[in-house]
From Swiss-Prot:
Lineage: Eukaryota, Viridiplantae, Streptophyta, Embryophyta, Tracheophyta
Ranges for region Disordered: 1-58
Keyword Repeat: yes
Protein name as it appears in the record: F-box/kelch-repeat protein At2g29600
F-box domain mapped to chain residues: 56-103
Kelch repeat residue intervals: 161-208, 210-254, 260-309, 311-355
Gene3D superfamilies according to UniProt: Kelch-type beta propeller
UniProt KW Chloroplast keyword: no
Family matches, as SMART domains: Kelch (SM00612)
Organism this protein belongs to: Arabidopsis thaliana (Mouse-ear cress)
Entry keywords, A to Z: Kelch repeat, Repeat
Length: 415
């Protein structure tokens, strides 16, 4: 019977920094003893195929040439290359390698998803990485060097980093905590705390600045904060308070489009213009934007994509163009696998739609007492006539759990 797989640290400094006295997270090493941990994946017969196209590298090659050579290769080959020598292992865990990858344009999108387990007992959310074992197969693996997250935290990504803000501590106390994850090495460190404790807030990145909205008692002077990643400082954003939203709304559903952050606040739909610093109500009856995006959605190239139930539209994926103020079908996608999409998560994966979900609803297991997690990869193409076409490129079984998973969110970084 399969179980949750782990990513090892491979000597990449993946341990926790010193814990704060209030820090509720468990030590990452304790996670290795929990029931939901996986066995190490078995070596398959395709081990040799992973390095089939890797160029031969002389053992005495200078370190600089090793860096420039490895930087051109896909990251799925790195675990095998790290076994060749100490020099290779040193290069693969170095900052120079990732800087070189960025300079020559060989970076890749990497998907992370935050998963909690609710059956038989609730567990704090943990990060999983969707990685390629070779050129084709995908595997969803627990990142053991990262601690559990606070429930209700909000996250954004910039380059190879994930910024995590707020959430609920023990006894449902809101947190001001902020930390950043370096996805190159799976390390993390604390940043300056927010000025206001928040949970289930909305967040967005505009012009390299991180905005956090709501998740606290509603007051005009501090309901919005902005974080400068260069100076590690927070500032309140003065603005006229939205008359439409509730005071302590959990902003589970939000996205950024045209420099505005759109928020589903109960039955209200509000938008905050991050540059103009003003609120708008975009939810009156007849506003098409609110039709489909409440379940499964993400933004690609400033267009909003959503998966819709079969009875609401003739195609399973639709796209919203803010310039046209309306939804259109994504052509070429006549069907999607019958996952429970209301419990799935979709994200922009290098210009593609990547969906993680299960065929069974939460707390429902198969004959073997497991829940299978599937990944659907949908490629997108804009034709000359402006129509958006899609194609389901793959459907992959990426993990099996003995507990009931809940997909909290998915994020993509560039590494």
């Amino acid at each position: 019977m399969a179980s949750i797989s782990e990513t090892s640290d491979d000597g990449s400094n993946g341990g926790d920094p010193n814990q704060k006295p209030e820090e509720p997270h468990k030590n990452p090493q304790e996670g290795k003893e929990e029931e939901n941990q996986n066995e190490k994946p078995k070596e398959d017969d395709h081990q040799e195929e992973e390095v089939e196209n890797v160029p031969q590298i002389p053992p005495q090659m200078p370190l600089e040439l090793i860096v420039s050579t490895i930087a051109t290769l896909r990251r799925c080959h790195y675990p095998t290359l790290s076994l060749l020598s100490d020099s290779f292992r040193q290069v693969i865990s170095s900052v120079d390698l990732f800087q070189t990858r960025s300079l020559i344009g060989s970076t890749e999108p990497v998907l992370y998803t935050l998963i909690t387990f609710t059956s038989p007992n609730f567990e704090e959310p943990r990060w999983f990485i969707l990685q390629r074992r070779n050129n084709t197969s995908l595997q969803l693996s627990l990142v053991t060097s990262l601690p559990p997250m606070f429930p209700g935290c909000t996250t954004v990504t910039i380059g190879h980093k994930i910024y995590v803000m707020g959430g609920l501590r023990s006894l449902n106390r809101r947190a001001k905590t902020v930390f950043v994850i370096d996805c190159r090495f799976h390390t993390w460190r604390y940043l300056q705390e927010m000025q206001v404790a928040r949970s289930y807030a909305a967040s967005a990145v505009i012009d390299g600045m991180i905005y956090v909205v709501g998740g606290s008692t509603k007051r005009s002077d501090d309901w919005v904060e902005v974080f400068n990643v260069e100076t590690n400082t927070w500032e309140n954003v003065p603005s006229v308070l939205s008359p439409y939203g509730r005071s302590k709304a959990p902003f589970n559903v939000h996205f950024v489009l045209d420099n505005k952050i759109y928020i589903l606040d109960g039955n209200n739909r509000v938008a905050y213009d991050l540059r103009g610093r003003r609120w708008e109500d975009w939810g009156p009856a007849g506003n098409q934007l609110g039709y489909f995006w409440q379940v499964l959605y993400c933004v690609v190239d400033n267009l909003l994509y959503a998966v819709v139930p079969d009875h609401l539209h003739v195609t399973p994926i639709v796209v919203y163009d803010p310039r046209e103020m309306g939804w259109r079908p994504v052509m070429g996608v006549d069907y999607l696998p019958n996952l429970v999409y209301s419990e799935s998560r979709m994200t922009n994966f290098g210009g593609k739609l990547m969906i993680l979900g299960c065929y069974q609803s939460q707390a429902r297991f198969d004959y073997y007492g497991e829940v299978n997690v599937w990944c659907v990869e949908v490629a997108l193409e804009r034709r000359e006539d402006g129509e958006i076409w899609g194609k389901v490129q793959s459907l992959s079984l990426v993990n099996k759990f003995r507990k009931s998973p809940v997909f909290v969110l998915s994020r993509t970084v560039t590494v």
